[in-house]
């Protein structure tokens, strides 16, 4: 059992077609493109159709990830969906997704860890694979934050977007592996970022900013230590795409050059649990990472939750 490795075998994303630019927001909010860009780095974000639910936007991403892995939905043993915008309170979005995929009755459940949800899910998939319980697990981050945004609140309406990203984590006897994971939470800071049932998202931006940088830096260093690696061994750091100021501050604290920290927040805004798989996919497509590279993923989110993963792609 100790020789089992867990590799990311396939990746897929789904980005809604509708684009909402900063100039569009100027038409109904007391804001401007300059104000938004300077404070967040965001130029535009994608918005799902009103009828679309998390499982709907997750489906194309999941299909692409499974196809890229050279598998079929019938090969998937478990489906884990990280989302803060589930289809329903229950059943889980993962159950809806598994059914839409035509999977063979896999274990299916959701994770509610806000923007940290995807790396929480990846950590669980890693453990399930290495325990020998499963061989192929679909991990998805899918969000339709446009449905829980107060569009009159410029502090949050300018930040969030919709999207989905998915990976297939599979048993492997090759070199690829999830090497280490550090996952944490602190419920005493719940008021920094939260969404009451049936209401809209609320955020204390300044408090969130400070907590985000410190938590991601600490988790990243611990994950590297557990993996027996240093930052010099890491090809690319892929942080949660929350705010360009947070990303830049993290890079500065970790003494990393800009080219080794991936960012696509200008195109999509903050897509919460979907941000890391979307960024991972685009970095791969752009040739910034390749098989055999060491990658560091790190995120923070409401809860507060945070964590980091080191993997060999």
UniProtKB/Swiss-Prot annotation:
Residues 241-245 are annotated as: ACP-binding. Gene3D superfamilies: 3.40.47.10. The keyword Methyltransferase does not apply. Pathway: Lipid metabolism; fatty acid biosynthesis. It is found in: Cytoplasm. The active site is at 115, 240, 270. GO terms for biological process: fatty acid biosynthetic process; secondary metabolite biosynthetic process. GO terms for molecular function: 3-oxoacyl-[acyl-carrier-protein] synthase activity; beta-ketoacyl-acyl-carrier-protein synthase III activity. InterPro entries: ACP_syn_III_C (IPR013747), ACP_syn_III_N (IPR013751), FabH (IPR004655), Thiolase-like (IPR016039). GO terms for cellular component: cytoplasm. HAMAP family: FabH. Homodimer. This is Beta-ketoacyl-[acyl-carrier-protein] synthase III. The gene is fabH.
